[in-house]
Protein backbone atom coordinates (compact mmCIF):
# COMPACT_ATOMS: atom_id res chain seq x y z
CA UNK A 1 0.00 0.00 0.00
CA UNK A 2 1.23 3.46 -0.87
CA UNK A 3 1.46 5.80 2.07
CA UNK A 4 0.60 9.47 1.82
CA UNK A 5 3.65 10.24 3.92
CA UNK A 6 5.74 10.22 0.77
CA UNK A 7 4.01 13.43 -0.34
CA UNK A 8 6.05 16.41 0.93
CA UNK A 9 4.07 18.85 3.07
CA UNK A 10 4.88 21.87 0.91
CA UNK A 11 3.90 19.83 -2.15
CA UNK A 12 0.39 19.21 -0.75
CA UNK A 13 -0.02 22.83 0.35
CA UNK A 14 0.64 24.05 -3.18
CA UNK A 15 -1.57 21.40 -4.77
CA UNK A 16 -5.31 21.96 -4.90
CA UNK A 17 -6.06 18.39 -5.91
CA UNK A 18 -4.18 15.23 -6.71
CA UNK A 19 -5.39 12.70 -9.24
CA UNK A 20 -4.00 9.20 -8.67
CA UNK A 21 -4.16 6.61 -11.39
CA UNK A 22 -2.41 3.27 -11.51
CA UNK A 23 -2.50 -0.40 -12.26
CA UNK A 24 -5.01 -2.69 -10.56
CA UNK A 25 -2.15 -4.45 -8.78
CA UNK A 26 -1.54 -1.34 -6.71
CA UNK A 27 -3.86 -0.65 -3.78
CA UNK A 28 -4.46 3.11 -3.73
CA UNK A 29 -7.59 3.14 -1.56
CA UNK A 30 -5.86 4.14 1.63
CA UNK A 31 -3.79 6.78 -0.12
CA UNK A 32 -6.89 8.32 -1.66
CA UNK A 33 -8.68 8.47 1.70
CA UNK A 34 -5.70 10.14 3.31
CA UNK A 35 -5.43 12.51 0.38
CA UNK A 36 -9.10 13.46 0.76
CA UNK A 37 -8.70 14.31 4.43
CA UNK A 38 -5.46 16.19 3.95
CA UNK A 39 -6.85 18.19 1.04
CA UNK A 40 -9.90 19.24 3.03
CA UNK A 41 -7.70 20.38 5.87
CA UNK A 42 -5.53 22.41 3.55
CA UNK A 43 -8.38 23.99 1.60
CA UNK A 44 -11.88 24.32 3.02
CA UNK A 45 -14.43 24.81 0.24
CA UNK A 46 -16.79 27.75 0.60
CA UNK A 47 -19.68 25.92 -0.98
CA UNK A 48 -20.52 22.31 -1.36
CA UNK A 49 -20.13 22.31 -5.10
CA UNK A 50 -16.62 23.74 -4.69
CA UNK A 51 -15.49 20.65 -2.80
CA UNK A 52 -12.38 19.26 -4.43
CA UNK A 53 -12.69 15.48 -4.90
CA UNK A 54 -9.78 13.10 -5.26
CA UNK A 55 -10.94 10.03 -7.15
CA UNK A 56 -9.39 6.62 -7.13
CA UNK A 57 -8.82 5.55 -10.71
CA UNK A 58 -7.85 1.91 -10.37
CA UNK A 59 -7.76 -0.49 -13.28
CA UNK A 60 -6.30 -0.98 -16.68
CA UNK A 61 -9.15 0.90 -18.33
CA UNK A 62 -7.74 4.16 -17.04
CA UNK A 63 -4.49 3.40 -18.79
CA UNK A 64 -6.24 3.51 -22.14
CA UNK A 65 -6.27 6.85 -23.89
CA UNK A 66 -9.86 6.69 -25.08
CA UNK A 67 -11.20 5.90 -21.62
CA UNK A 68 -10.31 9.22 -20.00
CA UNK A 69 -12.58 11.54 -21.97
CA UNK A 70 -15.63 9.23 -21.78
CA UNK A 71 -15.39 8.32 -18.14
CA UNK A 72 -18.20 9.93 -16.15
CA UNK A 73 -16.22 10.11 -12.95
CA UNK A 74 -13.32 11.81 -14.65
CA UNK A 75 -15.66 14.33 -16.30
CA UNK A 76 -17.24 15.14 -12.93
CA UNK A 77 -13.86 15.56 -11.32
CA UNK A 78 -12.63 17.70 -14.20
CA UNK A 79 -15.61 20.07 -14.03
CA UNK A 80 -15.23 20.82 -10.32
CA UNK A 81 -11.53 21.13 -9.69
CA UNK A 82 -8.44 22.65 -11.17
CA UNK A 83 -5.68 20.11 -10.73
CA UNK A 84 -2.14 21.23 -10.35
CA UNK A 85 -0.68 17.75 -10.42
CA UNK A 86 -1.60 14.43 -11.98
CA UNK A 87 0.48 11.52 -10.69
CA UNK A 88 0.50 8.22 -12.53
CA UNK A 89 1.92 5.09 -10.90
CA UNK A 90 2.93 2.71 -13.65
CA UNK A 91 4.52 -0.73 -13.18
CA UNK A 92 7.72 -1.25 -15.09
CA UNK A 93 6.21 -3.91 -17.32
CA UNK A 94 3.38 -1.62 -18.47
CA UNK A 95 3.52 0.72 -21.42
CA UNK A 96 1.50 3.91 -21.01
CA UNK A 97 1.10 6.35 -23.88
CA UNK A 98 -0.93 9.54 -23.46
CA UNK A 99 -1.53 10.40 -27.09
CA UNK A 100 -3.94 13.17 -28.02
CA UNK A 101 -4.65 15.15 -25.00
CA UNK A 102 -6.87 12.95 -22.94
CA UNK A 103 -5.90 15.00 -19.90
CA UNK A 104 -6.14 18.18 -21.91
CA UNK A 105 -9.40 19.33 -20.30
CA UNK A 106 -7.94 18.87 -16.83
CA UNK A 107 -4.51 20.27 -17.56
CA UNK A 108 -5.59 23.21 -19.71
CA UNK A 109 -7.13 25.26 -16.90
CA UNK A 110 -4.08 26.38 -14.96
CA UNK A 111 -0.90 27.24 -16.78
CA UNK A 112 1.06 25.57 -13.96
CA UNK A 113 -0.41 22.08 -14.40
CA UNK A 114 2.05 19.24 -14.69
CA UNK A 115 1.91 15.58 -15.63
CA UNK A 116 4.14 13.20 -13.67
CA UNK A 117 4.55 9.63 -14.82
CA UNK A 118 6.77 7.29 -12.79
CA UNK A 119 7.82 3.74 -13.48
CA UNK A 120 7.89 1.50 -10.40
CA UNK A 121 8.29 -2.23 -10.04
CA UNK A 122 7.35 -2.52 -6.36
CA UNK A 123 5.75 -0.30 -3.77
CA UNK A 124 8.99 -0.13 -1.83
CA UNK A 125 10.80 1.06 -4.93
CA UNK A 126 8.13 3.68 -5.43
CA UNK A 127 8.49 4.93 -1.87
CA UNK A 128 12.21 5.30 -2.42
CA UNK A 129 11.89 7.08 -5.75
CA UNK A 130 9.05 9.33 -4.73
CA UNK A 131 11.20 10.91 -2.05
CA UNK A 132 12.93 12.72 -4.89
CA UNK A 133 9.67 14.51 -5.70
CA UNK A 134 10.39 16.89 -2.82
CA UNK A 135 12.75 18.56 -5.30
CA UNK A 136 9.97 19.04 -7.80
CA UNK A 137 10.70 22.73 -8.21
CA UNK A 138 14.24 22.01 -9.41
CA UNK A 139 13.22 19.36 -11.97
CA UNK A 140 13.28 20.42 -15.64
CA UNK A 141 9.86 21.37 -16.98
CA UNK A 142 8.76 20.85 -20.57
CA UNK A 143 5.55 22.23 -22.09
CA UNK A 144 4.00 20.67 -25.20
CA UNK A 145 1.46 22.75 -27.16
CA UNK A 146 -0.74 20.81 -29.56
CA UNK A 147 -4.36 20.98 -30.71
CA UNK A 148 -4.46 17.73 -32.67
CA UNK A 149 -3.71 14.07 -32.04
CA UNK A 150 0.01 13.71 -31.53
CA UNK A 151 2.06 10.85 -30.17
CA UNK A 152 3.70 11.99 -26.96
CA UNK A 153 4.89 9.24 -24.64
CA UNK A 154 4.48 10.48 -21.11
CA UNK A 155 6.00 7.34 -19.62
CA UNK A 156 9.15 7.52 -21.75
CA UNK A 157 9.21 11.28 -22.12
CA UNK A 158 12.43 11.70 -20.21
CA UNK A 159 15.47 9.80 -19.19
CA UNK A 160 15.89 12.18 -16.30
CA UNK A 161 13.38 13.65 -13.84
CA UNK A 162 11.28 15.83 -16.13
CA UNK A 163 7.90 17.45 -15.54
CA UNK A 164 5.95 17.17 -18.79
CA UNK A 165 2.91 19.38 -19.37
CA UNK A 166 0.59 19.02 -22.37
CA UNK A 167 -1.69 22.00 -23.03
CA UNK A 168 -3.89 23.28 -25.81
CA UNK A 169 -2.41 26.33 -27.60
CA UNK A 170 -5.55 28.37 -27.04
CA UNK A 171 -5.22 27.90 -23.28
CA UNK A 172 -2.11 30.00 -22.90
CA UNK A 173 -3.72 32.81 -24.89
CA UNK A 174 -6.77 32.81 -22.60
CA UNK A 175 -4.54 32.94 -19.52
CA UNK A 176 -2.13 35.47 -21.03
CA UNK A 177 -3.35 38.24 -18.71
CA UNK A 178 -2.35 36.22 -15.62
CA UNK A 179 1.27 36.16 -14.55
CA UNK A 180 2.75 32.70 -15.12
CA UNK A 181 3.33 30.86 -11.86
CA UNK A 182 5.64 28.31 -13.50
CA UNK A 183 8.37 28.88 -16.06
CA UNK A 184 9.36 26.07 -18.40
CA UNK A 185 12.83 25.05 -19.49
CA UNK A 186 11.50 23.99 -22.87
CA UNK A 187 8.35 24.60 -24.94
CA UNK A 188 7.51 22.35 -27.88
CA UNK A 189 5.06 23.96 -30.34
CA UNK A 190 3.32 21.31 -32.43
CA UNK A 191 0.39 23.53 -33.38
CA UNK A 192 -0.61 27.18 -33.01
CA UNK A 193 -4.30 26.43 -32.34
CA UNK A 194 -7.10 28.71 -33.49
CA UNK A 195 -4.70 31.63 -33.86
CA UNK A 196 -3.39 30.08 -37.09
CA UNK A 197 -6.75 30.41 -38.85
CA UNK A 198 -6.80 33.12 -41.54
CA UNK A 199 -3.19 34.01 -40.68
CA UNK A 200 -1.67 32.91 -43.98
CA UNK A 201 -1.24 34.86 -47.19
CA UNK A 202 -4.35 33.25 -48.71
CA UNK A 203 -6.57 35.36 -46.44
CA UNK A 204 -4.98 38.73 -47.12
CA UNK A 205 -7.98 39.73 -49.22
CA UNK A 206 -10.11 39.81 -46.07
CA UNK A 207 -8.33 42.58 -44.26
CA UNK A 208 -10.35 42.39 -41.02
CA UNK A 209 -9.99 38.63 -40.55
CA UNK A 210 -6.34 38.71 -41.60
CA UNK A 211 -5.49 41.47 -39.13
CA UNK A 212 -7.33 39.70 -36.31
CA UNK A 213 -5.54 36.43 -37.06
CA UNK A 214 -2.14 38.10 -37.10
CA UNK A 215 -2.95 39.82 -33.81
CA UNK A 216 -3.96 36.48 -32.25
CA UNK A 217 -0.79 34.85 -33.52
CA UNK A 218 1.27 37.67 -32.04
CA UNK A 219 -0.49 37.19 -28.70
CA UNK A 220 0.34 33.49 -28.93
CA UNK A 221 4.05 34.25 -29.48
CA UNK A 222 4.07 36.68 -26.56
CA UNK A 223 2.43 34.11 -24.28
CA UNK A 224 5.00 31.48 -25.25
CA UNK A 225 7.88 33.85 -24.49
CA UNK A 226 6.42 34.63 -21.06
CA UNK A 227 6.23 30.92 -20.19
CA UNK A 228 9.87 30.23 -21.10
CA UNK A 229 12.48 30.66 -18.41
CA UNK A 230 15.64 32.61 -19.06
CA UNK A 231 17.94 30.35 -21.04
CA UNK A 232 15.06 28.02 -21.98
CA UNK A 233 14.36 26.59 -25.43
CA UNK A 234 11.38 26.98 -27.76
CA UNK A 235 11.07 24.13 -30.26
CA UNK A 236 9.02 24.85 -33.36
CA UNK A 237 7.94 21.68 -35.14
CA UNK A 238 7.98 21.49 -38.90
CA UNK A 239 5.00 20.98 -41.15
CA UNK A 240 3.74 21.18 -44.68
CA UNK A 241 1.46 23.48 -46.59
CA UNK A 242 -0.45 26.02 -44.54
CA UNK A 243 0.99 24.79 -41.24
CA UNK A 244 4.54 25.38 -42.46
CA UNK A 245 3.64 28.93 -43.50
CA UNK A 246 2.06 29.59 -40.10
CA UNK A 247 5.09 28.20 -38.28
CA UNK A 248 7.39 30.44 -40.30
CA UNK A 249 5.30 33.40 -39.23
CA UNK A 250 5.44 32.20 -35.60
CA UNK A 251 9.21 31.94 -35.88
CA UNK A 252 9.44 35.55 -37.06
CA UNK A 253 7.17 36.73 -34.24
CA UNK A 254 9.20 34.81 -31.65
CA UNK A 255 12.36 36.49 -32.91
CA UNK A 256 10.60 39.85 -32.64
CA UNK A 257 9.85 39.02 -29.00
CA UNK A 258 13.56 38.62 -28.24
CA UNK A 259 14.38 34.95 -28.86
CA UNK A 260 17.68 34.06 -30.50
CA UNK A 261 18.63 30.99 -32.50
CA UNK A 262 19.99 28.19 -30.33
CA UNK A 263 23.13 26.23 -31.08
CA UNK A 264 22.70 22.76 -32.56
CA UNK A 265 24.78 21.06 -29.88
CA UNK A 266 22.65 22.49 -27.06
CA UNK A 267 19.42 21.55 -28.84
CA UNK A 268 20.55 17.97 -29.44
CA UNK A 269 21.54 17.50 -25.80
CA UNK A 270 18.23 18.88 -24.47
CA UNK A 271 16.08 16.82 -26.85
CA UNK A 272 18.02 13.64 -26.07
CA UNK A 273 17.54 14.10 -22.32
CA UNK A 274 13.98 15.39 -22.11
CA UNK A 275 12.16 14.75 -25.43
CA UNK A 276 13.56 11.53 -26.89
CA UNK A 277 10.21 10.28 -28.26
CA UNK A 278 9.21 13.37 -30.21
CA UNK A 279 8.62 12.19 -33.76
CA UNK A 280 8.03 15.63 -35.28
CA UNK A 281 10.95 17.23 -37.08
CA UNK A 282 12.07 20.54 -35.65
CA UNK A 283 11.99 23.46 -38.06
CA UNK A 284 13.65 25.96 -35.73
CA UNK A 285 14.79 26.17 -32.13
CA UNK A 286 15.03 29.45 -30.30
CA UNK A 287 16.46 30.29 -26.93
CA UNK A 288 15.44 33.00 -24.50
CA UNK A 289 18.42 35.16 -23.56
CA UNK A 290 19.50 35.34 -19.96
CA UNK A 291 19.66 39.10 -20.16
CA UNK A 292 16.55 41.28 -20.07
CA UNK A 293 15.77 43.75 -22.84
CA UNK A 294 16.46 47.37 -21.95
CA UNK A 295 18.47 46.59 -18.80
CA UNK A 296 21.71 48.51 -18.43
CA UNK A 297 24.77 46.41 -17.83
CA UNK A 298 26.89 47.31 -14.84
CA UNK A 299 30.35 48.30 -16.00
CA UNK A 300 33.25 47.00 -13.98
CA UNK A 301 35.82 49.70 -13.41
CA UNK A 302 36.97 52.50 -11.16
CA UNK A 303 33.92 54.17 -9.66
CA UNK A 304 36.00 57.25 -8.77
CA UNK A 305 36.80 58.02 -12.39
CA UNK A 306 36.71 61.63 -13.50
CA UNK A 307 33.91 62.81 -15.80
CA UNK A 308 34.40 63.08 -19.52
CA UNK A 309 36.71 65.87 -20.61
CA UNK A 310 38.60 65.97 -17.30
CA UNK A 311 42.17 64.69 -17.29
CA UNK A 312 43.91 63.71 -14.11
CA UNK A 313 47.33 65.38 -14.28
CA UNK A 314 50.32 65.34 -12.02
CA UNK A 315 52.90 68.08 -11.57
CA UNK A 316 55.71 65.64 -12.29
CA UNK A 317 54.30 65.01 -15.77
CA UNK A 318 55.07 68.53 -17.05
CA UNK A 319 58.13 68.83 -19.35
CA UNK A 320 60.26 71.94 -19.63
CA UNK A 321 60.22 73.07 -23.27
CA UNK A 322 63.73 74.45 -23.08
CA UNK A 323 65.08 70.96 -22.45
CA UNK A 324 63.72 69.75 -25.78
CA UNK A 325 66.22 71.88 -27.77
CA UNK A 326 69.88 70.97 -27.86
CA UNK A 327 71.94 74.18 -28.19
CA UNK A 328 74.84 72.25 -29.69
CA UNK A 329 72.84 71.29 -32.77
CA UNK A 330 72.15 73.61 -35.69
CA UNK A 331 68.53 73.95 -36.76
CA UNK A 332 67.21 75.27 -40.05
CA UNK A 333 65.29 78.43 -39.13
CA UNK A 334 61.68 78.57 -40.18
CA UNK A 335 60.41 81.68 -41.93
CA UNK A 336 62.39 84.55 -43.44
CA UNK A 337 63.87 87.63 -41.87
CA UNK A 338 63.87 91.17 -43.41
CA UNK A 339 67.14 90.60 -45.26
CA UNK A 340 66.17 87.29 -46.82
CA UNK A 341 65.41 88.89 -50.23
CA UNK A 342 68.90 90.35 -50.58
CA UNK A 343 70.35 87.20 -52.11
CA UNK A 344 67.56 86.84 -54.67
CA UNK A 345 67.54 88.49 -58.10
CA UNK A 346 63.96 89.63 -57.56
CA UNK A 347 61.89 90.49 -54.53
CA UNK A 348 59.62 87.83 -53.04
CA UNK A 349 55.89 87.98 -53.87
CA UNK A 350 55.06 88.35 -50.17
CA UNK A 351 58.07 90.47 -49.32
CA UNK A 352 58.04 92.08 -45.89
CA UNK A 353 61.48 93.69 -45.88
CA UNK A 354 60.47 96.65 -48.10
CA UNK A 355 62.46 95.64 -51.18
CA UNK A 356 59.36 95.14 -53.32
CA UNK A 357 57.99 98.61 -52.53
CA UNK A 358 61.38 100.19 -53.31
CA UNK A 359 61.63 98.43 -56.65
CA UNK A 360 58.10 99.48 -57.62
CA UNK A 361 58.83 103.11 -56.74
CA UNK A 362 62.06 103.06 -58.75
CA UNK A 363 60.26 101.51 -61.72
CA UNK A 364 57.58 104.21 -61.69
CA UNK A 365 60.19 106.91 -61.51
CA UNK A 366 62.02 105.36 -64.48
CA UNK A 367 58.81 105.31 -66.53
CA UNK A 368 58.14 108.98 -65.79
CA UNK A 369 61.63 109.89 -66.82
CA UNK A 370 61.40 108.01 -70.10
CA UNK A 371 57.98 109.50 -70.78
CA UNK A 372 59.17 113.04 -70.28
CA UNK A 373 62.27 112.61 -72.39
CA UNK A 374 60.35 110.92 -75.18
CA UNK A 375 62.24 107.64 -75.01
CA UNK A 376 58.97 105.76 -74.72
CA UNK A 377 56.47 106.01 -77.50
CA UNK A 378 53.15 104.39 -77.91
CA UNK A 379 53.34 101.11 -79.80
CA UNK A 380 49.60 100.74 -80.20
CA UNK A 381 48.68 104.34 -80.87
CA UNK A 382 45.72 104.28 -78.45
CA UNK A 383 47.37 105.80 -75.38
CA UNK A 384 45.63 109.16 -75.88
CA UNK A 385 42.13 107.54 -75.73
CA UNK A 386 42.25 106.80 -72.00
CA UNK A 387 42.83 103.89 -69.63
CA UNK A 388 40.15 101.75 -71.31
CA UNK A 389 42.30 101.56 -74.47
CA UNK A 390 45.75 101.44 -72.89
CA UNK A 391 47.91 98.35 -72.40
CA UNK A 392 48.69 96.84 -69.02
CA UNK A 393 52.22 98.30 -69.03
CA UNK A 394 51.31 101.62 -70.62
CA UNK A 395 53.12 104.53 -68.94
CA UNK A 396 50.04 106.74 -69.45
CA UNK A 397 47.83 104.57 -67.20
CA UNK A 398 46.11 106.73 -64.64
CA UNK A 399 46.25 109.85 -66.80
CA UNK A 400 43.25 111.41 -68.51
CA UNK A 401 42.79 111.19 -72.25
CA UNK A 402 44.48 113.78 -74.41
CA UNK A 403 44.59 114.80 -78.07
CA UNK A 404 47.05 113.13 -80.38
CA UNK A 405 50.31 115.11 -80.57
CA UNK A 406 49.45 117.16 -77.48
CA UNK A 407 52.39 117.68 -75.17
CA UNK A 408 51.95 116.35 -71.67
CA UNK A 409 53.98 118.16 -69.03
CA UNK A 410 54.82 116.49 -65.70
CA UNK A 411 55.82 118.33 -62.53
CA UNK A 412 57.61 116.14 -59.98
CA UNK A 413 57.78 116.80 -56.24
CA UNK A 414 59.56 114.67 -53.66
CA UNK A 415 57.38 112.82 -51.11
CA UNK A 416 58.51 110.32 -48.45
CA UNK A 417 57.55 106.71 -49.34
CA UNK A 418 55.35 104.82 -46.84
CA UNK A 419 57.93 102.10 -46.08
CA UNK A 420 61.68 101.51 -45.89
CA UNK A 421 62.56 105.24 -45.77
CA UNK A 422 62.53 105.37 -49.55
CA UNK A 423 61.36 108.27 -51.71
CA UNK A 424 58.58 108.13 -54.23
CA UNK A 425 57.59 110.80 -56.68
CA UNK A 426 54.12 112.26 -56.78
CA UNK A 427 53.45 113.71 -60.21
CA UNK A 428 51.04 116.49 -60.95
CA UNK A 429 49.90 116.59 -64.52
CA UNK A 430 48.16 119.51 -66.14
CA UNK A 431 46.06 118.56 -69.11
CA UNK A 432 43.19 120.53 -70.58
CA UNK A 433 43.39 122.88 -67.59
CA UNK A 434 42.71 119.98 -65.21
CA UNK A 435 45.21 119.19 -62.42
CA UNK A 436 45.59 115.46 -61.68
CA UNK A 437 47.55 114.14 -58.70
CA UNK A 438 49.03 110.60 -58.70
CA UNK A 439 49.34 109.24 -55.15
CA UNK A 440 51.53 106.28 -55.96
CA UNK A 441 49.17 104.28 -58.21
CA UNK A 442 50.54 102.39 -61.15
CA UNK A 443 50.92 104.47 -64.29
Swiss-Prot record:
GO MF assignments: 2 iron, 2 sulfur cluster binding; 4 iron, 4 sulfur cluster binding; electron transfer activity; metal ion binding
Binding site for [4Fe-4S] cluster: 380, 383, 391, 394
Superkingdom of the source species: Eukaryota
Alphabetical keyword list: 2Fe-2S, 4Fe-4S, Cytoplasm, Iron, Iron-sulfur, Metal-binding, Mitochondrion
Annotated region described as Fe-S binding site B, given as residue ranges: 380-394
Record's keyword annotation contains Phosphoprotein: no
Region annotation Fe-S binding site A: where it falls in the sequence: 341-353
Cellular location(s): Cytoplasm; Mitochondrion intermembrane space
InterPro entries recorded: Anamorsin (IPR007785), CIAPIN1 (IPR046408)
Residues spanned by motif Cx2C motif 1: 380-383
Residue span of region N-terminal SAM-like domain: 136-301
Region annotation Linker: where it falls in the sequence: 302-331
Renumbered ranges of motif Cx2C motif 2: 391-394
One Gene Ontology biological process: iron-sulfur cluster assembly
Quaternary state and interactors: Monomer.
Reported function: Component of the cytosolic iron-sulfur (Fe-S) protein assembly (CIA) machinery. Required for the maturation of extramitochondrial Fe-S proteins. Part of an electron transfer chain functioning in an early step of cytosolic Fe-S biogenesis, facilitating the de novo assembly of a [4Fe-4S] cluster on the cytosolic Fe-S scaffold complex. Electrons are transferred from NADPH via a FAD- and FMN-containing diflavin oxidoreductase.
Domain-level remarks: The C-terminal domain binds 2 Fe-S clusters but is otherwise mostly in an intrinsically disordered conformation.
This protein's name: Anamorsin homolog
Organism: Toxoplasma gondii (strain ATCC 50861 / VEG)
Amino acid sequence: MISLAVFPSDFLRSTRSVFLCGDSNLDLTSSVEQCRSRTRDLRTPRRKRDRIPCLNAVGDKFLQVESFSRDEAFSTWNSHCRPLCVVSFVPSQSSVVFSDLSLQAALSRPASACLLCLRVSRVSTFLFRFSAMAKLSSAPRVLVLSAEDSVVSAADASKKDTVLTVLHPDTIIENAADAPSVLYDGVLILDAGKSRENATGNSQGKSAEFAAARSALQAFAQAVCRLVAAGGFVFLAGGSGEREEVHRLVKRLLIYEGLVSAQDSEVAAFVADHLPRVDSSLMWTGRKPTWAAGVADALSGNRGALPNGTAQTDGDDFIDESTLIDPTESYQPLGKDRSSCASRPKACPNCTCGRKEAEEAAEKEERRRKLETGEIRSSCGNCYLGDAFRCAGCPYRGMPAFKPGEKVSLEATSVEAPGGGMQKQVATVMSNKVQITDLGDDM
